[in-house]
Regions:
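Structural motif marking the loop-to-transmembrane transition
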Residues: 1-4, 106
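Sec-dependent N-terminal signal peptides
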Residues: 3-14
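Beta-strand-enriched cores of mature, soluble protein domains
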Residues: 19-153
């Protein structure tokens, strides 16, 4: 019984010291930054570079530079791999990677992993987040919202 009490106690303490962190990313599309290669009737490959803006629910905001690719397979979905470098208003930097496998190019759910950071972002190393993306109807912009669970160190 004592062991169960200790386990519950430390589990509750762990929950108390974790908090949610949300990031919103807004982008405007520019076809000049996208290369499209139609591999076959069923596979289309898109490579892109873009710069977007982000803000979080902690009052921080900044710029995000990304490069990545989408592989769209007809009747099977899309696979995304995106690498980004973010800078906040104070000059702190973070690097993250976005992965998504979904049925639809225009919307889906994926994973963000913070690879490393400087300044305030040092403590985010290795943190994983879930994100959802929706593109505008003409695919000339998108909205991403991510939710992360951080632990204080």
């Amino acid at each position: 019984m004592k062991i169960l009490f200790i386990f519950i106690y430390f589990s509750l303490i762990n929950l108390l010291f974790s908090y949610d962190f949300e990031v919103e990313i807004l982008s405007a599309g520019d076809e000049r930054d996208t290369n499209i290669f139609k591999y076959s009737d069923t596979i289309t490959y898109r490579h892109f570079n873009n710069t977007t803006n982000w803000k979080d629910n902690l009052g921080d905001w900044g710029k995000l530079q990304c490069a990545g690719n989408h592989t769209i397979i007809k009747n099977q979905g899309t696979i995304l791999k995106n690498y980004c470098k973010g800078t906040n208003k104070d000059g702190d930097i973070f690097w993250l990677m976005m992965d998504r496998k979904s049925n639809d190019f225009d919307s889906g759910i994926g994973k963000i992993v913070y690879e490393k950071g400087t300044g305030k972002f040092e403590k985010y190393d290795g943190v994983q987040c879930v994100y959802a993306i929706t593109f505008l109807p003409e695919r000339d912009g998108s909205f991403i919202k991510s939710k992360c669970k951080f632990k204080d160190k």
